[in-house]
Amino acid sequence: MLSITPVALAKTRQSHLIDFIYSHQNGNESFGVSPQDTANAIEIINYYNAYVVEILFEPTKSVEKSALKGYLGDEIQAMFDTGEIDIYKIYNFLETLNTLESLATSLDSDLHNEIYNYINETVQIGGGFSPTNSSNNANMVSTYYIYNILKIMGEPIDNQTLHKSWVLSCNNTDGGYGGNQTLSSTLFTTYYAVYLINELGIINDLANQTATLNYFKSLYIGDSNNLEHYGGYLPDLYSEFPLLSSTFFCVEGIGLIDETELSRVATSNWVLSQQSFLDGGFSDWVEGTDQRFSSISTSYYAFKILQFFGSLSLLDEEVFMVELDILTLIIVLSVIGVIVLVIYIIWRRRRI
């Protein structure tokens, strides 16, 4: 069947990545399956100014900015109309809007005030922010996202010293940080803590800078004989495979503390090796299986790691990818058909 026959095409890694992202575009101009997917996709599209992509023999790919902005505003407003407010969705909606156009002009002033008033109700007396205005418990994840909501909206963050002290109180003896004062360290909450300390003060304010640096470094796969995983970072010490997400958080975290501790070449090469030759996206191994899956989020983490290292030029390399392209198949098969026909005619003439 033409619709399922793969064809190998040579384009730049960047072009394959953009094609992959557009293959996950939805009818309402959003991308993927979550607000985060849309925010990630638009950041990459915006970086490459790929809002309209026209390639010979391929359908035009594009983002209708005004339609997407309208959709995002409606989604935020619907949350407040129903009372089902999700700060993580709000963050990603605002991030997307701000990429498309400054929030100063793209966000309705009444909606801006609704968001700001709600956020103010999540502030905790002891520092940090709770995930909802009905909760009295701050956690690292909600504090990270609410801090960044305020930052995107251009609103001041009051009591920064109090919030910084709360973040520091989540420090653990392993050098990592938990989601609150009682939880064990995780890579993600440790990164959020390091980011917040750097934003609310200076990186030297970390409870134990060396221990936190070693926490990140302990997840690095530095065995050059491990060709498949060398250069990546594990999500935890019990994991079998490095992930693009864990590598992103480790690279960003180490970069904030001491950038010289990073292995730029090894990690960049590992990231490139994660690009799928089937769909052009970047993929991770799935624990417990022998399969890999590409997604917008994994592709975004790959993009951000290369961007951090100043290595996005590596995506200019031309590579062959297997694509399911009906038009290309028709062209290829037509050429083959012509060649076969010529051979047949020559053969017939020789027989005569």
Task: Label the predicted regions.
Residues 1-6, 30-60, 78-107, 130-158, ...:
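An alpha-helical repeat/solenoid feature that recognizes helix-turn-helix modules
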Residues 8-10:
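Boundary at the C-terminal end of the N-terminal hydrophobic targeting segment
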Residues 12-31, 59-83, 109-133, 157-176, ...:
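Long, well-ordered core segments of solenoidal/helical folds
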Residues 316-335:
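Juxtamembrane/start-of-transmembrane alpha-helix segments at the extracytoplasmic/lumenal side
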Residues 346-348:
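Structural signal for the C-terminal ends of transmembrane alpha-helices
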Residues 350-352:
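Cytoplasmic C-terminal tails of single-pass
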